[in-house]
């Protein structure tokens, strides 16, 4: 479990997140994912949540002999996580943002695939299993490597998925992307382990979509602040944050972000409309929808 990097005054919520994701590789994914909830729950003790997860892993680890095979550890983990602890997908309220907050998933035992996968992979890691998240189109999955071969699990319901089932799930995506027929992309390319930054981005994109759909501009801005820090090379995050600043009546901040986007993407398809919006903001005119 990571210890706090802040020996003196505590950081701001956003500063804490920025420090966690500053490293190019190997940042503390679980800790960063937990602290996302501090936008709604600023008093959340991230270290206490990490300790709770460690406690769950320790209980299962104590039941297993030191020489337990990888297959036995996997079977024990699946029963413990999905049956005994009762973790499952939140089928009744899938789009509740609480499903993206790991401390709430721990409390309710309900979540979405990506948060369930984060918890499962952490427990697997503490059992000595190699488990990674997979950004499968439309549904986050878990991939484990065993001496007997590779296992793919749907964290929403705990089912192991066969190659045929995975191919079937890919069918609609391949059709939409024009990847069927002679140009079909091998299944294995869709089952590559997702880097930590991509996993965290996918979690934040879920929250971004929820807030945008609800036109909840303050919450949307909070998520976008994190995305700009997490994906500093992605100019579209600046553009989107700029538009949210405009919705919140903050023209100076909106103009800064839109200017930065247009500087990096002068030939983007939306550049002409955004230049008009930027001119309005700089004149002090009322913002209008694009």
Indicate residue ranges for each PLM-predicted region.
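A structural boundary/capping signal
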Residues: 1-290
